[in-house]
Amino acid sequence: MSAFGFPGGGAPTPPQGSFWDMTPEQQGMYSANLIMGTMQSCPGKSVMAGVTGFGLGGVFGLFMASMAYDAPVGMGVQTMSDLPFKQQMKIQFTDMGKRAWSSAKNFGFIGGVFSGTECCIESLRAKNDIWNGVAAGCLTGGGLAVKAGPQAALVGCAGFAAFSAAIDVYMRSDNKAPPSTDEDL
């Protein structure tokens, strides 16, 4: 992998002539290598994290909006129970859509920025350890909170870094060698 996760030689070259001159097995291997190279690059990882975060954020936003029993934000409604059922449903679905869209954008942005930052740091350091996630968390958290001032940026940096460290420690805890006997369990 070369600088910032871009594959060094670009796309793999077909072994002979064009793609359509290959056997089905060669086409499959060529396509698989092309997909794996894209997914292992920093832009590929960032896009995948952003798209996945967008989808999960949308589902999370729908769920959280459906659990909110208060009046929807910005609708000018004092009590929902005073409105007819059809209007209540219209307001609730509108609110669910707005909250889902907002959560989807936020989760997608955070996922893409964190993943891209972590991948770039990993490429620059040429190491895969816990400190890549901690540094990426700090940069992401601080960057997201920078508009609120330096104190908020510092708190965002510390919070995201701590959360990233906790997740990395948990995810890397299974990388131990298996026990030699059942008694070691």
UniProtKB/Swiss-Prot annotation:
GO biological process: protein insertion into mitochondrial inner membrane
Main location: mitochondrion
S-S bonds: C42-C119, C138-C157
InterPro entries to which the protein is assigned, alphabetical: TIM22 (IPR039175)
Subcellular location per the Swiss-Prot or TrEMBL entry: Mitochondrion inner membrane
Membrane topology, from the record: Multi-pass membrane protein
Membrane spanning stretches: 47-67, 130-150, 151-171
Presence of keyword Nucleus: no
Alphabetical keyword list: Disulfide bond, Membrane, Mitochondrion, Mitochondrion inner membrane, Protein transport, Translocation, Transmembrane, Transmembrane helix, Transport
Pfam families cross-referenced by the UniProt entry: Tim17
Any single GO CC term annotated in Swiss-Prot or TrEMBL for this entry: TIM22 mitochondrial import inner membrane insertion complex
GO molecular function, one term: protein transmembrane transporter activity
Protein role: Essential core component of the TIM22 complex, a complex that mediates the import and insertion of multi-pass transmembrane proteins into the mitochondrial inner membrane. In the TIM22 complex, it constitutes the voltage-activated and signal-gated channel. Forms a twin-pore translocase that uses the membrane potential as external driving force in 2 voltage-dependent steps.
Quaternary assembly: Component of the TIM22 complex, whose core is composed of TIM22 and TIM54, associated with the 70 kDa heterohexamer composed of TIM9 and TIM10 (or TIM8 and TIM13).
Family: Belongs to the Tim17/Tim22/Tim23 family.
Protein name in the entry: Mitochondrial import inner membrane translocase subunit TIM22
Species: Yarrowia lipolytica (strain CLIB 122 / E 150)
